[in-house]
Amino acid sequence: MIRITQLKLSVNHTEVQLHKKIARTLKCPEGSFSYEIIRQSLDARHKEDKKFVYTVDVVVPNEKQILKKVHNKNIMSTEKKKYQFPKPGSTRLVHPPVIVGSGPAGLFCAWYLAKAGYRPLVLERGEQASRRKETVDHFWKNGVLNPDSNVQFGEGGAGTFSDGKLNTLVKDPNGRNHEVLKRFVQAGAPQEIVYQQKPHLGTDVLIGIVETLRHQIEEMGGSFRFEAKMTDLLFEEGHLKEVEVNDQEKIPAEVCVLALGHSARDTFEMLNRRGVYMEPKPFAVGLRVEHPQSMINMDLYGEEENEFLGAASYKVTHTCENGRGVYSFCMCPGGYVVNASSEPGRLAVNGMSYQARDSKNANSALIVTVSPSDFPDDTPLGGIAFQRDLERKAWELGEGRIPVQLFGDFRKNQASTDFGEVTPQMKGGFVLSNVRSILPKAVGDSIEEGMLAFGRKLSGFDREDALLSGIESRTSSPVRIVRSKEGLSNIEGIYPCGEGAGYAGGITSAAMDGIKVAEFICEKFRNF
């Protein structure tokens, strides 16, 4: 197989033009080869001449002869590495593995265990995806919160109500990344997510995909129980014996995968009481910022709209004078700011996009790093206490609605009274307020400095009427559940997994960690 890199075409090229370009590059007839796109990225450094840049793998009969006659540093021989799931171990497993949580980590752990014959049982405290969507829509419209089924909890996890980004910075030579994208495509995602530089699905598409993954798992012997919250774990001599559900039912189990998600605070508290080792983890907090999407497009594309490129996205970072980092996170082109609360009397926000990314605003979190030294205590749950305090203040400031402030007023530390040209694109009620008043001073100062710095990179980013809303507090898990190189916690049979356990950040990396934990289990235990 031949790999070609740095293959550039105009952004409005056709598939035929790509095929012809490959033929010219390899100096071979157009009908003599097949190809697969490995990667597509955008080069917009020259706004008047934007290019898609491709990496492609080409299968051609006379590969050696072509490589001899074509001397080009961007052309090389390559071999495709195929992902291999391990063979089952020898330890007898009496009961099916229990997986707590049906986010990407739990779903992908369940998928691979089911495929290998382990008949996993998935417990999910929230509702099935379609019912969950109805519950979330009702919350956004009427403010009635279901603490167990919301933007954070329910089938698909917190990522279901997000932009659905699938890119990850995790380097994985074992091929799990490609496995995740392949499974998404087989569950209904568009084929191009496999090779796009910044693939995304959108909330409307993700809901159907996670339901399809569930059906696949069930067809392979797995099972699901919704509105089934793990409320306790019962141990005997350092080994897992039972999983308690809804404070009543006890399920015998030798293996339990904790794919909890980053917001399962009550579960973290229970695990801490039960002596499961965990530690506080640095994370980041801040606000959502909204700008006109047309402005971001102009900054990055040199035009307000381009049918071949869609809504533009950005990523910005800055190191502040106080030593803290401030950066954009979970940027949602053509998206919405959403009320992402999961506890009564506390308010958190997140960003979300549909597949079309056709809202008039771009939004992103602007977040500032915080560490255990910022937390009110040095216990494993100190970060949770820090989050809860900020969310309580946000809820009180907006009286249950999302508090919003113009950047010009944020700089003056005064409540906003009217919108400028930028108007909110939000899911859930909102109210003009002084958002800065609830932030720790270091966080507020860092966001102001960051906004001004980003305005020097992206024209208009620091405009007076840019909207800030909060609080963005669920950027990653505030704890890490300690696990060994075999994937186990200090309690035999407990496997921490995914973002909530502190081993991932985002949909794809969480799914990859789910596969990794499935491998740990398979390497040790026999299947049924």
Residues of each region from the PLM?
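Residues forming the flavin
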Residues: M1-K50, V56-F161, K165-F528
